[in-house]
Amino acid sequence: MKMENVVDAIQEMALQLRKINEIAYNQYKPIASDLCSRVASLSEVEYTLDRMLDFCGDDAVLGLFKDICRHYFDIYPEMIAYQINSYREIWDAE
């Protein structure tokens, strides 16, 4: 495979990843708004954050993740701490 083709393939993958992240943000934005407007069950918040973790490499989705964590930290501190640690294990560069 020529280098030019490799570069084109990588650019296409990057474009697709951006599109997927945009879709994830658009799907999770109303869910995050809803969760932050009330007190949801631990299982509902945990389920949502677990699924959002896959997309937290995107700053917009990460912002939603953080909003939910801030809203529920005093309500479900152990679960939120676990979710934050999971984020760090997956996405922190260090």
Q: What is each stretch, according to the model?
A:
Residues 7-16:
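Polar/charged low-complexity regulatory segments
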Residues 11, 46, 65-69:
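Generic structural concept
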Residues 15-63:
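Amphipathic alpha-helical interaction modules
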Residues 59-94:
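Amphipathic alpha-helical binding modules
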